[in-house]
Amino acid sequence: GSEMCIRDRYGDNGIVAFCFYIATLFRDIITDSTRSFPILNIYGKKGTGKTEFALFLMALFQNNPEVSNLESTTYYAMGEKCAEVSNMLVHFDEYKNSLSNKHIDFLKGVYDNAGRSKRSSDGEHREATKINCGVLITGQEMPTADIALFSRVIFLESQKSERSKEETDKYQKFLKLRNMCPTNITVGLMRYRENFNAGWYD
């Protein structure tokens, strides 16, 4: 299955990421009681496969997913992107500690389900857009610009390693599965929504 494939490729990191994916599917149920939900951060230097890792997780939700570069994505666009979906992953690439305070504050707010602040339709007051998606960030820098942000992420480090013939074969199998756009896995898991809801509150 897909969980075996991702475990073969990424080991314990793959297991953690797959658990995050499942939690994202039922994020609304989880946050009804926890009021918070962490960000998944895949960190790694260039060539370590972090983007391939992230794209596999995104492929579980949609074909040819859009990846937003944080440096060229405004604070407002981040909010709109997160508000568009529910119980689904949103991917922001190229995290850097030099990002603006607004970008960093937005990411911190994701943990508490708070999006960007905007003026209400009547113009009388400001309101925060609610976030109900899982957020995945990737980059070559650890998110240490603000310790409060670092405490809100599940931190996974993607490391480059020399591949044996067997590992290369597993990698090709991994890419093949990703390119098939395995959204059927997500559809299959949604059948267990009622079971998850009941079990979560047991």
Which sequence ranges carry the predicted segments?
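A short glycine/serine-rich beta->alpha loop
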Residues: I6-D12
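Short, small-residue-biased leader/transition segments that mark boundaries at the very start
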Residues: G1-C5
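Conserved NTP-binding/hydrolysis core of motor NTPases
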Residues: I15, T24-Y201
